[in-house]
């Protein structure tokens, strides 16, 4: 309990001799002052005293988790490991997977949390923003006064390894040179594109050349092209000043927006193409993955590759844990329950392709 006691002004100090103090009668008790909030005492000379005798009656203060803290705790700790056997023979039902998916916090970023002037002009979707703690910052090789912003995040890979991927949106007309600057800056040697240019409306601009083109200070050339049933592979070179590098570009177009492919086989073949690419093993830079918004199909591809690596190395996969890790790095990764179910189906198919293991 906080008690208030009257006090004299500092301009009139109290002086009282010892004798006078002993002969004067005790002062009359004055009624207790009305409780006043601390905010209302600003500028006052009223002294504050804490009555420690009352502390035992005060309930202990309990820490209350904010929604943000709850979100982060869930994403950091949730998991549902499935053995190869369980994934193939006792998988969760579609209803169970939908319920599990809907419990995962999206971890989207609000515009108020992204204090970067002018970023809206470089966002394809105003509600899909890069999480600040993992966003890619451009070093501005172009010497422009556009700041360091690009709608892209570093994404962890298998076993939590840092910066294995960069998840980003499909380039816009005013961000194509930013995209190539990111590719150069991060020493990217592999780009995986998971959208068509138009799906009813524009999903991504044609950011690579037919033969040769210059984007900002970067010159891009097509060296070779290979058509596969489900995807197209292009070998590019990117040149900045006198230095030239090779980049492999894979366009996987058999995946409708907000939906899933007709079968899991093509996606697994795409993962195998990436896994077997010399660019994957020989270069330390991250793999750039994008669709249109950079969260749905992008998240599915990255989660599929991580899940395949878990199954191969451990004999089990934690799909819930994978999605939570992805959403910590970029909000909204894996957009729909249908995509979450398809991810389980795809990894069950992959588990069946691995060498046989004994039943539990």
Curated annotation (Swiss-Prot):
Binding sites annotated in the UniProt record for substrate: 257, 291-297, 335
Tissue expression notes: Expressed exclusively in thymus and spleen.
Its EC number(s): 3.1.3.48
Matches recorded under InterPro entries: Prot-tyrosine_phosphatase-like, PTP_cat, Tyr_Pase_AS, Tyr_Pase_cat, Tyr_Pase_dom, Tyr_Pase_KIM-con
GO cellular component annotations of the record: cytoplasm; cytoplasmic side of plasma membrane; cytosol; microtubule cytoskeleton; mitotic spindle; nucleoplasm
Activity regulation field: Inhibited in cells after FCER1A triggering.
Effect noted on mutating residue 335 to A: Reduced catalytic activity
One Pfam family, short name: Y_phosphatase
GO biological process: MAPK cascade; protein dephosphorylation; signal transduction
Cysteine sulfenic acid (-SOH): modified positions: 291
Post-translational modification: Phosphorylated on serine residues in resting T-cells. Phosphorylation increases upon exposure to stimuli that increase intracellular cAMP levels. Phosphorylation leads to dissociation of bound MAP kinases. Oxidized at active site cysteine. Treatment with pervanadate (vanadate and H(2)O(2)) or with antigen enhanced oxidation of active site cysteine.
Consequence recorded when altering residue 125 to A: Strongly reduced catalytic activity
Domain Tyrosine-protein phosphatase intervals: 97-350
Main enzyme class: hydrolase
Region (Interaction with MAP kinases): 38-51
Active site (UniProt): 291
Xref: CDD domains: PTPc-N7
Function in brief: Protein phosphatase that acts preferentially on tyrosine-phosphorylated MAPK1. Plays a role in the regulation of T and B-lymphocyte development and signal transduction.
Family: Belongs to the protein-tyrosine phosphatase family. Non-receptor class subfamily.
Name of the protein in question: Tyrosine-protein phosphatase non-receptor type 7
Source taxonomy: Eukaryota, Metazoa, Chordata, Craniata, Vertebrata
